[in-house]
């Protein structure tokens, strides 16, 4: 996360360690020493799976044999790994499925990296790892004050999971604070060294953290504030902007950043996230098996022989093509496929609407007016309109003419001015956005006359 720090809730500050500067200085000195490091063992439930139980379900925390053996359970044969290519293969119902492991997963299996959970317990090894994390966070999150990062990383109420390249090089990590009473944890910092960001460490680290937290605590949710650059990463890791956790549970406990986007992740109880790629393939295999029982789409039929002699091609009845009738095809479907999917004005409407949505004055008009917040609005405004409704209508091909599109846009501005007073900010926002809209339309010669 990289965002300017504006405010931090009092409830989350706690008592600051008085010796934080001393601890940081001592840890910096320890990094220069050549000290053998003892691994911090994770719970036994988090051991790497060598084989997965068959069927449509995958058991949590299952642990396979160290040496793969020939066996078949529920139609799933033992996986075979091509170590050179990093490709994992397994058989399900006689069909081979395979997926490519991330470089970070391969490196962990080869013993080149490890994932270690550390906190400020004043031990030499943990302080060295925490200092390595602090340095990465300070470099990768330049908008955060360095003293603030150091204070939280060394805070004894926080835990960190670090990615360590052996023997002892910290390449990234996540610092988080658990709130077990509320069954959630706050991800405070998350960063990978800039030289290591193409090897899948970020995703693999998050999967390790989810499995570790779920196996050792009663925590079910992650909350974090993400800046614009981090939103994409968190979305890929299962986070969403829709916060379902009750506000009374977390409000006042987590650090609040102005300009950040609050995101939430609910951890599924029956999923082992380190095996997510295999689980998804198993689900696909089970679905394909079910499809084959009710459909004939998997049958490969021979090609048409009429095209072998190109000099004597004759028209054929489509219904005589093997499998076409069984697939449910009709001549009407062919006619429907020939119709254009979008109207002639679609691209222009989409571009104009996108620019409207991104305009600085558009925020009051992005969504419909909340009936609970403004109860009398719909009594006064009989034909409400907003930019999200326009987007839905556009995607559903409900704007046959550009005049209809312009009508709805003007409806937004007129409704706002009709309901709000002339001296209100909403009235001024409507004028600004309307002026921008008119300017964009006048830039398109074939539509500029429609504004008159």
From Swiss-Prot:
Cellular compartment(s): Nucleus
SMART domains xref list: BROMO (SM00297)
Annotated EC: 2.3.1.48, 2.3.1.-
Domain of life, per lineage: Eukaryota
Domain Bromo: 340-444
Biased composition (Basic residues): 1-10
Gene Ontology terms: cellular component: ADA complex; chromosome, centromeric region; cytosol; histone acetyltransferase complex; nucleus; SAGA complex; SLIK (SAGA-like) complex
Active site residues of this protein: 186 (proton donor/acceptor)
GO biological process terms, semicolon-separated: chromatin remodeling; negative regulation of induction of conjugation with cellular fusion; positive regulation of transcription by RNA polymerase II; positive regulation of transcription elongation by RNA polymerase II; transcription initiation-coupled chromatin remodeling
InterPro entries for this protein: Acyl_CoA_acyltransferase (IPR016181), Bromodomain (IPR001487), Bromodomain-like_sf (IPR036427), Bromodomain_CS (IPR018359), GCN5 (IPR037800), GNAT_dom (IPR000182)
Region described as Disordered: spans on this chain: 1-78
N-acetyltransferase domain: residues covered: 113-268
SUPFAM superfamilies according to UniProt: Acyl-CoA N-acyltransferases (Nat), Bromodomain
Catalytic activity: L-lysyl-[protein] + acetyl-CoA = N(6)-acetyl-L-lysyl-[protein] + CoA + H(+); (2E)-butenoyl-CoA + L-lysyl-[protein] = N(6)-(2E)-butenoyl-L-lysyl-[protein] + CoA + H(+)
Binding site for acetyl-CoA: 190-192, 197-203, 229-232
Site (Important for catalytic activity): 186
UniProt cross-references to Pfam families, sorted A to Z: Acetyltransf_1, Bromodomain
Main location per the UniProt record: nucleus
Listed PROSITE patterns: BROMODOMAIN_1 (PS00633), BROMODOMAIN_2 (PS50014), GNAT (PS51186)
A GO term for molecular function: histone H3K14 acetyltransferase activity
UniProt keyword annotations, A-Z: Activator, Acyltransferase, Bromodomain, Chromatin regulator, Nucleus, Transcription, Transcription regulation, Transferase
Hydrolase is among the record's keywords: no
Main enzyme class: transferase
The family this protein is said to belong to: Belongs to the acetyltransferase family. GCN5 subfamily.
Purpose: Histone acetyltransferase that acetylates histone H2B to form H2BK11ac and H2BK16ac, histone H3 to form H3K14ac, with a lower preference histone H4 to form H4K8ac and H4K16ac, and contributes to H2A.Z acetylation. Acetylation of histones gives a specific tag for epigenetic transcription activation. In addition to histone acetyltransferase, can use different acyl-CoA substrates, such as (2E)-butenoyl-CoA (crotonyl-CoA) and is able to mediate histone crotonylation.
Protein's UniProt name: Histone acetyltransferase GCN5
Native source organism of the sequence: Eremothecium gossypii (strain ATCC 10895 / CBS 109.51 / FGSC 9923 / NRRL Y-1056) (Yeast)
Gene name per UniProt: GCN5
